[in-house]
């Protein structure tokens, strides 16, 4: 049976700031989805920080207009409640005035896979808040490239043969299909820069879908800062794919990601329990793990993948790393480079003042001898 799993998320309002959606907002979204008739086989609704996600199973394929419109209508209903309740950032991820056939490029994040359902279909959804799509680069690399992190890359015949990894240039809206293991150095070079190059999807070499992730950057759509992109990722697990615990353990080393308060800092990505609010301790970037089984499109779960006691220790590591880097204040790399600052207009205003105070240096070197571009040390 061919099934599509669609995961669509958006930030349409938070209590007192970028914290969590209200009960009324969640109810409005749930009511809209539940009143969709027989469009869906099953669904689940939850949140990560102030982002609400809708997990849907159906038979309509990816990029289906009816499915995307349902999600759009649900988020619009949530937005109306957010406005009535005075929630912060009401509708902030809905960047267009009306639905135009597909929510991609309109603000909400989307991860979708269509596949022939296995007898024991298993998949995990990773929902993140206060960060950008490139936050998943490091965990995905560990899943499919790093044998020190994932023994399956040695002992599992399918994974050992390599996968096809589609990497997107989010600045130019271009995509490259790269193969392991022949393109390993190229993949690594791209993933060095998660602000520009992000993993869009992963397939087996036989064309079986394994992973899909949201890749839209909100400031690329809106032209100005409206919030961090808060990505979502869908990963099929078990058998010829990474095991559930192999996928989950890729988040056990809280790596530094762009995001945090005002979307302008580097901070560790903290694994948290399902339906966790965003921290008001500088909005540490967070990620949740929703583990599902599925049969004939009916969902069982989610199991809270980051709820067991061992993850409390990982959260402690993330907290200590967060405190350490925030103690550096505004000095890079605690903050992002100017081109990645989400409040760039304010920074430019400060630099304009600085520029008016700059005077030529009086020495023997001409201006033409001076290095003007300090990004390239060579």
Where are these regions (language model features)?
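Regulatory and interdomain segments flanking nucleotide-handling catalytic cores
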Residues: 1-378
